[in-house]
Amino acid sequence: MKALAKLKPEEGIWMVDAPKPEMGHNDLLIKIRKTAICGTDVHIYNWDEWSQKTIPVPMVVGHEYVGEVVGIGQEVRGFKIGDRVSGEGHITCGHCRNCRAGRTHLCRNTTGVGVNREGSFAEYLVIPAFNAFKIPDDISDDLAAIFDPFGNAVHTALSFDLVGEDVLITGAGPIGIMAAAVCRHVGARHVVITDVNEYRLELARKMGATRAVNVAKENLKDVMKDLGMTEGFDVGLEMSGVPAAFHAMLDTMNHGGKIAMLGIPGGEMAIDWSKVIFKGLIIKGIYGREMFETWYKMASLLQSGLDLSPIVTHHFKVDDFQQGFDAMRSGQSGKVILSWD
């Protein structure tokens, strides 16, 4: 089968002819329709320090996808041939304390599709049936293909009550932008998102952000004053992993504010803990998606009118995958979709 793989420990992704994956008793075989390129895939392409420590070579990569069930393991119930599915990319052990308590997103033995095991940049993918999620008919293939990062946005945004609250989002990557759209959809008052990438900030404006702030040109506290905010942000969503962005968030949070952190700093990050302590801030780390409450929320948000379509900015045939990676690496894109049909 046709696939995209990390073949060598150097920059790049390569088209290969890979063996069709074999299905176990509890697995589904999925024929891939569309995949999306994740920031993680760009890290793997660039072969940065994280990738060198994490990614086995050679391996088929990719983990954002939608496809059709074409094979069902003999122990599987609840799926049929032809079902349209996406899937949770974190494969969990089922045996640790968190898994047995239903907190599978906190499994300490997680393996990642396209990170630790064969991924979805291929004509066929095998995953445990437990990880598959049926896509409602009224949700497009494009949006189904980005359920994985959309889930990161939903999990982060819905960590705290947002109704009538003022929200600061640091980092206008696709996940941060989708989080802004979610916050507005569920009833936040002001949703302010910060970055230095004008292309992405304009996307955030299209997706409903109250203000999209280029912090290289504008002062965040001036923006707050323009909006009539006198006390600070109630909720912070840190999506960038940039220390300066987190410092700005701590400076502008209201007392008793709540912060959800999805962005991963490049190394250890020193902060002024007195701001956390004296403001009485709550900080919550976010990893992946809650299985499968986040997935149900994603489908429900889209079915209730949340419009994510502007976040998908580029489409390519899989044979033109290099153009897709070039678009993602340029920073001048939202989500990039590769078609496998």
UniProtKB/Swiss-Prot annotation:
GO molecular function list: L-threonine 3-dehydrogenase activity; zinc ion binding
BP GO annotations: L-threonine catabolic process to glycine
Catalyzed reaction equations: L-threonine + NAD(+) = (2S)-2-amino-3-oxobutanoate + NADH + H(+)
Active-site residues (renumbered): T40, H43
Listed SMART domains: PKS_ER
Enzyme Commission designation: 1.1.1.103
Disulphide bridges, residue numbers: none
Important for catalytic activity for the proton relay mechanism but does not participate directly in the coordination of zinc atom, annotated site positions: D148
SUPFAM superfamilies given in the database record: GroES-like, NAD(P)-binding Rossmann-fold domains
Cofactor note: Binds 2 Zn(2+) ions per subunit.
Keywords: Cytoplasm, Metal-binding, NAD, Oxidoreductase, Zinc
Any one Pfam family match given in the protein's UniProt record, by short name: ADH_N
Enzyme class: oxidoreductase
GO cellular component: cytoplasm
Cofactor: Zn(2+)
Family to which the UniProt record says this protein belongs: Belongs to the zinc-containing alcohol dehydrogenase family.
Entries under NCBIfam families matching the protein: PRK05396.1, tdh
Function: Catalyzes the NAD(+)-dependent oxidation of L-threonine to 2-amino-3-ketobutyrate.
Protein name: L-threonine 3-dehydrogenase
Species: Shewanella amazonensis (strain ATCC BAA-1098 / SB2B)
Classification of source organism: Bacteria, Pseudomonadati, Pseudomonadota, Gammaproteobacteria, Alteromonadales
